[in-house]
């Protein structure tokens, strides 16, 4: 085995690690600390939460346009309205 081969492997390995932004610890902490996006539009943006235990039964702590709030766990069906040249998605009532 040539002595150049391990050196080439080491250089490629170091360059590949630089392409990945952030450390694995930061990515894991971000996933744990930030709640998932809401699956339905929040009914009330005043019920803020920091943990799942802050929400009542049937609600989940999630991230929405108005912050981290308690939102319904059920998926909200949306109606599709077609217009000329575009499509608009509206919440179902």
UniProtKB/Swiss-Prot annotation:
Q: Keywords on this record?
A: Disulfide bond, Protease inhibitor, Secreted, Serine protease inhibitor, Signal
**Range of residues in the leader sequence:** 1-22
Question: Where is this protein primarily located?
Answer: secreted
One cellular-component annotation, GO:
extracellular space
Location of the protein in the cell = Secreted
Task: List residues of the WAP domain.
Answer: 24-73
**GO terms for biological process, alphabetical:** antibacterial humoral response; innate immune response
GO MF term list: serine-type endopeptidase inhibitor activity
Positions of disulphide bridges:
45-66, 49-61, 55-70
Q: What does this protein do?
A: Putative acid-stable proteinase inhibitor.
What name goes with this protein?
Answer: WAP four-disulfide core domain protein 13
């Amino acid at each position: 085995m040539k002595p150049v081969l391990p050196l080439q492997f080491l250089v490629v390995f170091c360059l590949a690690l630089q392409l990945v932004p952030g450390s694995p610890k930061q990515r894991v902490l971000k996933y744990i600390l930030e709640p998932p996006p809401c699956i339905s539009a929040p009914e009330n943006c005043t019920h803020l939460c920091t943990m799942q235990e802050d929400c009542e039964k049937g609600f989940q702590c999630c991230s929405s346009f108005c912050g981290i709030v308690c939102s319904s766990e059920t998926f909200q069906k949306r109606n599709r309205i077609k217009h000329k040249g575009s499509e608009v998605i509206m919440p179902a009532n």
